[in-house]
């Protein structure tokens, strides 16, 4: 993965998405290009070298956040793509609560209430098992 290109695209997307006159369509393009570049761990062949772990984690966190931001932007237009992005995030990090909320909203837009509720229940179980905590208030509010 070209980490510099990935980060540059995310930065451009952030600049386009914010500001007095957001350019959402262009931001979506930058985020989508960045997500397409992310294929997993940074320098996987050097996984056990200490110097790569902080950078690997930083890039992964940036990628997961970018996938959720992109999913949020795409939600009104293509809820199925938003759902796919949420599921990709959860496959990498099953405790990423923002991805559960995105998944719940995508299912709700598709009028698939049972799956939205199931997503919440999975979130509750995973967070309890991993950390012994309940979901954030905004997650519970979305459920209710």
Listing of model-derived features with the role each one plays in the protein:
Residues 1-144:
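Intrinsically disordered, charged and Pro/Gly-enriched terminal/linker segments
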